[in-house]
Structure formats: C-alpha cells, structure tokens
C-alpha cells in the first residue's frame, strides 16, 4: 500500500458560508453564522464539506446519478451502468467507499482545512444582508444577516489517498483532481446560486 498526499491552498474568490450551530442567541446578532474552530474562534472548512461536495459532483460527472433513490452510488447499482461509464464508476467506488463492501476500504481522507498563514491579519468575517422579495407588493421581507468568510482568504487543504496494490494510482489521483476542478467550477458551502463559495485550488504537491 502507498499513501499519496495532495496538498495546497483553497483561495476564496467570493464570500464563503459553511454554517455552524450557534449555542447562544444574541440580540442584534448574525442569524446564520459560519462554523469556527472551538479553540481559536477562527473559521475553517470541514473536510466532510469538501469531500461531500467532490463526491456529489463526481457522481454527476461520472453519470451515475439516477440509478438509485438519490443516495450515494453503490456497487449494487453498477450492473445498470453502461459499459462506457463503468471504469469511472468503479474508480469512484474505490475512492469514496462502497457500503456494499465490494471495493474494499475507502481510499480518500480529507482533513479539515484551517486558515493559511497568509490570512493572518485579514478580516475573516463579513455580514451580508439578504431578504425575500414579495412578488405582489414589490417589497423586501424577512431580512436576515448571513456571515461569510470574505474573498481573498486562503485555507490549507490536505487530501490523502490510499493506493492498494491492485489499484491504479493514476486513476485514483486523477479522480481526486477531477473532483477539485469540478468544485472550482461550481461552488463550496451554501447559497451558491447567490454567488457564494467560488473558490480556486492551488495544488502544491
């Protein structure tokens, strides 16, 4: 077995919102806060958020969405996939795991993404006001504040891929990089349709 590290930075091109639970309600406070490290009170990107977004987009890209009930793709559904798409589908199952167990252990591990040192001293929080437009009255209703990490802030990411003896390193690593490209062309976090979560990945190794 071999472990391949894919490291680099995530640069925010627009404000990012990944929600965190608020333990206390503050009068005049922000309605939707971002998730923050409990020790430093600084924002971070959960590895589960990045991994989940990659997997979702890769399932669309590999054309395996629609074979089940909306749950993640499994080997049980592989027989329904056209032969031309099976190679990608199998790589996807190896990378993210298969609850049926046919493809062994999950190969990918995505760590939480902490702030890059270049973000020291930068403003790490902004409040964006949003509302709903009443179509009949033409007025704004239900105003709320959403916290975002501003554009320009960078986070470090660290992805590790287990390559077993029977695996193709090129296929697994290629699938990871394909997933990162898909996220970069879509969005990360919430409210992507409003322009949130545009990111760029800088791979250093």
PLM region spans:
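RNA-binding basic/glycine-rich loop and surface signature characteristic of RAMP-family CRISPR effectors
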Residues: 1-130, 136-205
């Amino acid at each position: 077995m071999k472990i391949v590290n894919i490291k680099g930075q995530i640069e925010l091109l627009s404000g990012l919102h990944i929600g965190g639970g608020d333990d206390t309600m503050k009068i005049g406070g922000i309605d939707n806060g971002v998730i923050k490290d409990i020790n430093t009170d600084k924002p971070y990107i959960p590895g589960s958020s990045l991994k989940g977004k990659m997997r979702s987009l890769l399932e669309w890209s590999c054309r395996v969405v629609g074979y089940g009930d909306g749950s993640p793709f499994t080997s049980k559904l592989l027989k329904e996939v056209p032969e031309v798409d099976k190679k990608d589908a199998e790589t996807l199952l190896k990378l993210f795991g298969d609850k049926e167990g046919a493809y062994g252990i999950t190969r990918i591990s995505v760590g939480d993404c902490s702030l890059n040192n270049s973000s020291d001293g930068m403003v790490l929080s902004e409040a964006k006001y949003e509302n709903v437009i009443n179509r009949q009255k033409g007025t704004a209703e239900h105003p709320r504040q959403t916290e975002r990490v501003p554009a320009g802030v960078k986070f470090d990411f660290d992805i590790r891929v287990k390559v077993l003896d029977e695996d193709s390193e090129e296929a697994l690593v290629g699938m990871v990089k394909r997933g990162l490209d898909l996220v970069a062309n879509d969005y990360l976090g919430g409210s992507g349709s409003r322009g949130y979560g545009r990111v760029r990945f800088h791979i250093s190794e």
